[in-house]
């Protein structure tokens, strides 16, 4: 029988504390992340590197990513791209619509519900570096999905400068956040 390798990358859990603290702070203080995810816990866990030929096959993250997580269950995963010095290595997410390929660039972060299967395509040249972690949410995935659409409605209303829509969607968004996070 042929050996099946789920992944071919290098991972390190030895994340410098200052990097973890800075990234956690940036995530907590991002208005969009707060509006959509409403994070209650952010866990910055791994630095990973995919050299030429590196990949991560399709998988689903565990709700409880670590045995010593003190019964913290995670709702979202994220990957933060650290470089542009590679070809291939795209992040692939499978949702209700199908597979979506994200060729992340340096500084881009992708946050996704951990219930979605995902993978990293094979790196064809160079080295892909990223930081990955997980978040718990104060609201359920379904509630967060609704908040995302209300947030987008609010953003669209602001673009159209329709004051009545801005106020209405802001009120609904704030009500939902308050209702679901208590």
Question: Residues of each region from the PLM?
Answer:
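Catalytic core of non-heme Fe(II) oxygenases with the double-stranded beta-helix
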Residues: 32-149
């Amino acid at each position: 029988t042929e050996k099946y390798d789920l992944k071919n990358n290098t991972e390190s859990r030895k994340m410098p504390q200052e990097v973890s603290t800075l990234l956690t702070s940036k995530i907590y203080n991002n208005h969009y992340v707060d509006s959509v995810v409403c994070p209650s816990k952010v866990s910055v866990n791994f630095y990973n590197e995919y050299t030429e030929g590196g990949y991560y096959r399709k998988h689903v993250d565990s709700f409880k990513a670590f045995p010593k997580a003190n019964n913290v269950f995670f709702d979202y995963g994220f990957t933060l791209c650290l470089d542009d010095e590679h070809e291939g290595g795209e992040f692939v997410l499978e949702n209700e619509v199908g597979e979506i390929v994200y060729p992340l660039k340096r500084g881009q972060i992708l946050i996704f519900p951990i219930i979605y299967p995902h993978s990293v395509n094979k790196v064809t040249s160079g080295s892909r570096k990223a930081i990955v972690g997980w978040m718990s949410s104060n609201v359920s995935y379904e509630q967060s999905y609704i908040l995302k659409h209300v947030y987008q409605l609010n953003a669209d209303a602001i673009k159209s400068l329709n004051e009545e829509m801005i106020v209405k969607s802001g009120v609904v968004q704030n009500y939902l956040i308050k209702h679901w996070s208590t």
